[in-house]
């Protein structure tokens, strides 16, 4: 199954959780925080402005992004994988290599 988000929505695959701290301590699954980074896997057509124009999104498929800890409260399961659906304005930054 493939998701096609509407308007200014973005579908994100969350990055893998860190299971070890910088000091080398292994964290159990319940203690590890969910990462607030991910990869954009689908984008909508754009934000519809008050005048009816559509503004293209600033993110694109494949972008690595950072989002807030409470962003993406809408989780959907697609082919056994949990994906986040959020508005573009919930994305804080694009990670550039």
From Swiss-Prot:
Gene Ontology biological process terms in this record: chaperone cofactor-dependent protein refolding
Disulfide bonds: none
GO CC annotations on file: cytoplasm
Keywords carried by this UniProt record: Chaperone, Cytoplasm
Subcellular location(s) per record: Cytoplasm
Function text: Together with the chaperonin GroEL, plays an essential role in assisting protein folding. The GroEL-GroES system forms a nano-cage that allows encapsulation of the non-native substrate proteins and provides a physical environment optimized to promote and accelerate protein folding. GroES binds to the apical surface of the GroEL ring, thereby capping the opening of the GroEL channel.
UniProt KW Chaperone keyword: yes
Protein family membership: Belongs to the GroES chaperonin family.
Subunit structure comment from the entry: Heptamer of 7 subunits arranged in a ring. Interacts with the chaperonin GroEL.
The name this protein goes by in its record: Co-chaperonin GroES
Listed NCBIfam families: PRK00364.1-1, PRK00364.1-2, PRK00364.2-2, PRK00364.2-4
InterPro entries registered for this protein in UniProt: Chaperonin_GroES, Chaperonin_GroES_sf, Chaprnonin_Cpn10_CS, GroES-like_sf
Organism field: Stutzerimonas stutzeri (Pseudomonas stutzeri)
GO molecular function: ATP binding; metal ion binding; protein folding chaperone; protein-folding chaperone binding; unfolded protein binding
A Pfam entry, by short name: Cpn10
């Amino acid at each position: 199954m493939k998701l096609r988000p509407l308007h200014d929505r973005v579908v994100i695959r969350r990055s893998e959780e860190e299971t070890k701290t910088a000091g080398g301590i292994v964290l159990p699954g319940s203690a590890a925080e969910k990462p607030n980074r991910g990869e954009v896997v689908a984008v909508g057509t754009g934000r519809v402005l008050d005048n009816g124009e559509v503004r293209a999104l600033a993110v694109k498929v494949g972008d690595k992004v950072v989002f807030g800890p409470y962003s993406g409260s809408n989780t959907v399961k697609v082919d056994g994988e949990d994906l986040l659906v959020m508005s573009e304005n919930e994305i804080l930054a694009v990670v550039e290599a």
